[in-house]
């Protein structure tokens, strides 16, 4: 991800639950910007529709430049506080960053393909932690399980990293495991139970 979007933000002059609620009603997301390059936490509001569109397009590891009333600040998403019922974004934590800086992020792992006939795959880890340049954070990693036989495994060490991205995750972290379908296991248990009953 070598590009980033610029989003306008306004400094918050009011605080508290009432102020945050009024901001959300007005279509704004209360947010806090923090980091080594920020002297003190900066409280701002961001347009909800614009930010939601950015996340849909760039993902949760998106880098964005805030235009805070004329002052530019490069940031990345650290936490999204989302309402579990409405999925509306209630609050944001944004980390102030600078070009050339490296950060640790959790990147989604996508599985593609089909394993050998008579088997199924189980994904044990949905993300892996890597260190990458702030302007080159991978959107996702893809692993292929095409034709893999029973017992085959894919670990974090098997994922191909590009550029200067490095693995932070334990290399032995299990990502995908090829196993027997659960139905077959249940059928085997039933057959064993039937055999035991027949011998009694």
Swiss-Prot record:
The reply to whether Iron figures as a keyword in the UniProt entry is no
Q: List the GO biological process terms.
A: translation
Record key words, sorted: Ribonucleoprotein, Ribosomal protein, RNA-binding, rRNA-binding
The cross-references to Pfam families, in alphabetical order and at most eight, read: Ribosomal_L25p (PF01386), Ribosomal_TL5_C (PF14693)
One Gene Ontology molecular-function label = 5S rRNA binding
A single GO cellular-component term on record: cytosolic large ribosomal subunit
Q: Does the keyword Zinc apply?
A: no
Query: What is the protein's quaternary organization?
Result: Part of the 50S ribosomal subunit; part of the 5S rRNA/L5/L18/L25 subcomplex. Contacts the 5S rRNA. Binds to the 5S rRNA independently of L5 and L18.
Q: What does this protein do?
A: This is one of the proteins that binds to the 5S RNA in the ribosome where it forms part of the central protuberance.
Family the entry assigns: Belongs to the bacterial ribosomal protein bL25 family. CTC subfamily.
By its UniProt entry, which NCBIfam families does this protein fall under? bL25_bact_ctc, PRK05618.2-1
Q: What is this protein called?
A: Large ribosomal subunit protein bL25
Gene encoding this polypeptide? rplY
